[in-house]
Every structure is written in C-alpha cells, then in structure tokens.
A protein has these predicted regions:
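N-terminal alpha-helical "arm" segments
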Residues: 1-36, 41-43
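Short amphipathic alpha-helical segments
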Residues: 4-12, 73, 77, 166, ...
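Charged, alpha-helical interface segments at or near domain boundaries
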Residues: 29-220
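Hydrophobic, Leu/Ile/Phe/Ala-enriched alpha-helical segments that form helix-helix packing faces
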Residues: 12-21, 81, 85, 89, ...
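Generic alpha-helical structural element
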Residues: 1, 5, 159-163, 231, ...
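C-terminal structured domains
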Residues: 224-316
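Assembly/interface hotspot detector across virion components, adhesins/toxins, and nucleic-acid enzymes
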Residues: 27, 212, 296-298
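Residue-level signal for secondary-structure boundary elements
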Residues: 20, 24, 93, 182-186, ...
Length: 316
C-alpha cells in the first residue's frame, strides 16, 4: 500500500509538470507533521515567483490517493488540479495581498478562524492568535472570494508592529467582521437532510422564532456559510443568547471546524459527550477539519469559556 501511495505521489508530480509546465524542482512533497503539512501529507506546488514571495498551492495527497483508489480517473484528478491552479492564478492573489501593509484597507477584511493549537503549533509560531485550551482563534485576512470559496492568509506578528496596533484592538475588529461576514445560525438535522434549500435559523435578532432543544440531543450551531462555522460560538453576543434561550450554562462539542453542538449542561455529562465526540471524529471528521476532542463549557454568570475534559490518551 505504501509503495502504491509513493508511486501515486510521484505520478502526480510528473502529471502536474506535464500539464502545466511548472518545473519539477518547484514541486515538492512534505510529510504530515512538517510546517506546511500539519494535518496531512501535501504536495507543494510553487506556481509564481515575485521579488519578495512565492505563490504556493498545497495539495492533500492522501485525499487525492483515496479518490484515486475509489475509482476517480487519474486524468480527472490532474484536470481538477490544473483547473484550481488556473483559478488561483486568475485571482491575482499576490497583488491583492499587498494591501496588507495598509491597516485601514486591511481592517474590513480581517476575520477569525479556529485551528487546533497543537497540530498547527509550527505554523502559529509567528501568527496572531489567542488560545482557549487547545483551540487557537487565529487572525486572518480575506484575500478573495469566488463561488463561496474564500482565499485567505494569516496575519503575522510583524504586521501588528508595522500597523502600530495592539493585538486586542485588531482582534475586536476581526471578531465583529466575522459576525457580519457569516452570521450565526442554528441548523436542524432533519431539515438539512430533507430540504436542500434549508439555510438554518436566525436566533440573534429581535423577532427571531428559534426554539433550542433543551434535552440531551443538543443543537447544531454554525454560520450562514457553514465553512469554518464553529467560530460562531465565540462571536459577539452569541454565547449569551444561547444561554438565555437554553436558560442554562451549556457544553460545546466541536465535531469539526465547521460546526459545534450546543448541549444544555443540565441533562448530559461532559464525559459522555467526549465519548460521542471521539466516535464522531474517528468515523466522520476529515483529518483537515479536526478541531479538538475536548469538551468546553460556557458559564452564563461569569461569561467565561472553560475546558472541562482532559486530553485523550492518544493526544498526550
């Protein structure tokens, strides 16, 4: 199996070179655990060089190999890769990131994403972020958005110094931007399964009629865009409103970076939730979408988030 995988990766390198003309020396493989491959093997394709930077596209080779094993033709995989590279080139991302030096132009584009602080520790060394347990709230700038797909870049510590801004001030702007870029929504599983047009339920505005489940089943929280929607629980006023609607403190179960289950803490134990989360991660959460296997709680009296379960044995 390993030899088949290695042969596939080598074939990918050759296929990309032949389809795009990108020199082989600009295509490199990095094993999981490297700085640019924290959650999975990646093929790094340098497709454009500038005076002060390279533009690089990272391909998750294990996912591509799985698709190949499941019957996807190799030619189709190469076509999808070249289409993505062409789309990225046309987006002119490098030029659009140059505004990053101007804080006033960058400010409306700032937003927050969640990452696992341990798995991404190498890449977070000079990033701007805050932590809660093993969750990192990371500062990003939106570069482009095409057909619902957002291209973004992390803000590095050096930019705060160049802007002359404190971390707390910039974070406050980014959290607020994140709310308006993709407002929070409650999603009903039965609606998601049977109604393709379902867009979730608003619960933050006066007049919203959204009743939360107060039993052990819990409520699925995400955002209108769903992608990276687990951040919703940390957006302004959201935790307070959830606690008000539940009339209770609540536990948070982050099934992926895209959503978080909200559970009334009167009817379920965190240890039981952690067992369910462990199974969900193993059976349904792609490696690159993993956030945490720990359970968190919101206290409505203190307005604080805390971690209430220890690390799993395989994380220590």
């Amino acid at each position: 199996m390993q030899k088949d995988y290695e042969t596939f990766v080598e074939k990918l390198e050759i296929g990309i070179y032949e389809a795009t003309g990108i020199p082989r020396e600009n295509i490199s493989f990095e094993k999981e655990g490297g700085r640019f491959a924290p959650v999975g093997d990646r093929l790094l394709v340098k497709f454009a060089e500038h005076d002060d930077a390279w533009e690089v596209c990272g391909l998750y080779t294990q996912e591509l190999f799985k698709s190949y094993q499941n019957g996807s033709p190799f030619e189709k995989i190469i076509k999808e890769i070249t289409d993505d590279l062409n789309r990225i080139k046309k987006a002119d991302i490098y030029e659009k990131t140059r505004v990053i030096r101007d804080y006033e132009k960058t400010k409306p584009r700032l937003f927050i994403r969640l990452l696992n602080a341990d798995k991404y520790s190498a890449d977070l060394q000079d990033a701007v972020y805050k932590t809660l347990g093993d969750i990192a709230l990371v500062l990003y700038m939106k570069v482009t958005e095409y057909e619902g797909c957002v291209t973004s870049t992390k803000i590095r510590q050096g930019m705060l110094e160049q802007w002359g801004k404190e971390c707390d001030e910039v974070f406050k702007e980014a959290i607020l931007n994140t709310y308006f870029m993709s407002p929070p929504r409650i999603y009903r599983w039965e609606q998601m399964i049977f109604n393709p047009e379902y867009e979730g339920e608003s619960f933050m505005n006066l007049g919203d009629k959204c009743e939360l489940k107060k039993d052990a089943m819990g409520n699925c929280l995400s955002t209108t865009k769903k992608t990276n929607g687990a951040v919703a629980v940390f957006l302004p006023g959201v935790a307070e409103q959830l606690a008000y609607l539940l009339d209770s403190d609540f536990y948070m179960v982050f099934t992926s970076v895209h959503e978080v289950m909200i559970h009334n803490d009167k009817f379920v134990e965190p240890e039981d939730l952690q067992c369910v989360l462990r199974d969900t991660i193993r059976e349904a959460t792609p490696k690159e979408d993993y956030l945490t296997s720990r359970i968190y709680q919101y206290n409505r009296e203190t307005h604080k988030f805390i971690c209430v379960t220890p690390l799993e044995e395989d994380e220590k």
